Amino acid sequence: MLRPFDYLYILATIAFTVYGQLILKWRIAQMGPLPTNAVGKVSFLISLLFDPLIASGFAAALVASFAWMAAMTKFELSHAYPFMSMNFVFVLLLSGWLLNEPITFQKVFGVALIVLGTVVASSG
């Protein structure tokens, strides 16, 4: 029997996934562009791996994975997975607000189509 509390596992999966994406983009943008030469690229990427905020993004992905595994003990995949489309909504809105990325009509329309398609697919 499902309890409303069980949906917290799905919510945690979404929250930690969105956090991970936003913190990675924010921190990488602060560190500058990827160098053009091979040695510079490798050095840059290795430095990213040891950045504490980047590490927190990876840790968030790990926590999201654990939350998803917990959700899978409570829900059928076909019921739970459509909720993951909310990642698109939250990343779009929060990247506009926190990262000052443009929120264009095309992006909003595209995300709306994804959510609508998810609702249609999960209701059948």
Could you describe each region identified by the protein language model?
Residues 6-12, 43-63:
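Loop-to-transmembrane-helix transition segments
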Residues 12, 59, 85-89, 108-112:
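Hydrophobic residues within alpha-helical transmembrane segments
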Residues 106-123:
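Hydrophobic transmembrane alpha-helices of multi-pass small-molecule transport proteins
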Residues 27, 71, 97-99:
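Hydrophobic/aromatic residues within transmembrane alpha-helices
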Residues 14, 18, 62, 88-93, ...:
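Hydrophobic/small/kink-forming positions within alpha-helical transmembrane segments
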Residues 66-86:
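Structural motif at transmembrane-helix junctions in multi-pass transporters
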Residues 1-30:
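Glycine-/small-residue-enriched transmembrane alpha-helix faces in small-molecule transporters
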Residues 89-107:
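C-terminal transmembrane-helix exit sites in multi-pass transporters
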